Amino acid sequence: MINVLLVDDHELVRAGIRRILEDIKGIKVVGEASCGEDAVKWCRTNAVDVVLMDMSMPGIGGLEATRKIARSTADVKIIMLTVHTENPLPAKVMQAGAAGYLSKGAAPQEVVSAIRSVYSGQRYIASDIAQQMALSQIEPEKTESPFASLSERELQIMLMITKGQKVNEISEQLNLSPKTVNSYRYRMFSKLNIHGDVELTHLAIRHGLCNAETLSSQ
C-alpha cells in the first residue's frame, strides 16, 4: 500500500485529488495538510510514502517544505503538483529534493502513474514539462526564463514576495534575518534588472510564475 499525503491550501483541490485516488487499488490517502509547515510535521510523525505538494501556499511554501522533507525524511517521495510549469521552476524543484513534477492540469491517470513511479524509485516529470526542460538545454536563447539566473533560495523568496509577504514575515518563516532577506531581494532586483516588489510581481505574472490576483495584496 502506498500511503499518500495531500498538501494544498485549497480544500477543494485536496478533496478532488482524494476522490481520484480513493478507488485506486494500492494507494491510500492517509492525511492532508494546508501549508508547508504542517506537511513537514506530518512526514516526521506519520508513515508517508508519497507527498503530493502544492507550490504556492501560505507560510514557507512548497519549495522550502520539499527541501525540509527531503533532508529529514529521505524515504518520502515528493511530487510537486502545481500550475507553475515555466522554466526554471521544474529544475529548481527537482534540485530541492522532489522526485516528480506535474501540472495541476494533469489527467487523473497521470497522477496515479506518477505516484507509482516515484514510489518505485523513479523520477517522474510530465512529458510536456520534460520537453520544455530538454528544449531549454538545446536552445537556451529561445526558452530561458529571466528567472533562470536566480538561485533556489532567491526563487523561493521571489515566490513569497509575489504572494504579498513582507520581509519580516519571510525572515520569520525561513529563519533568516530581515537583513539577509533584503540582501536576497536586492540581488534578485539586480539580476532581473528591476527596482521593486511590484515590478517583480509583474515580471513573474508575464512568465506564468504567479497570477494577477496577487497584485491586490501588494
Curated annotation (Swiss-Prot):
Keyword Transcription: yes
GO BP annotation list: phosphorelay signal transduction system; regulation of DNA-templated transcription
Localization annotation: Cytoplasm
Keyword S-adenosyl-L-methionine among UniProt keywords: no
PTM info: Phosphorylated and activated by BarA.
Occurrences of domain Response regulatory (ranges): 3-119
Main subcellular localisation: cytoplasm
Record Gene3D superfamilies: 3.40.50.2300
Chain residues forming the annotated DNA-binding region: 167-186
Residue span(s) of domain HTH luxR-type: 143-208
One Pfam family linked to the record: GerE
Residue list for modification 4-aspartylphosphate: 54
Gene: uvrY
Induction of its expression: Expression is regulated by SidA.
GO CC aspect terms: cytoplasm
Deletion consequences: Inactivation of the gene leads to hydrogen peroxide hypersensitivity.
Function: Member of the two-component regulatory system UvrY/BarA involved in the regulation of carbon metabolism via the CsrA/CsrB regulatory system. UvrY activates the transcription of the untranslated csrB RNA and of barA, in an autoregulatory loop. Mediates the effects of CsrA on csrB RNA by BarA-dependent and BarA-independent mechanisms.
PROSITE patterns xref list: HTH_LUXR_1, HTH_LUXR_2, RESPONSE_REGULATORY
NCBIfam families hit by this protein: PRK09483.1 (NF007018)
Record keywords, A-Z: Cytoplasm, DNA-binding, Phosphoprotein, Transcription, Transcription regulation, Two-component regulatory system
Protein name: Response regulator UvrY
Gene Ontology terms, MF aspect: DNA binding; phosphorelay response regulator activity
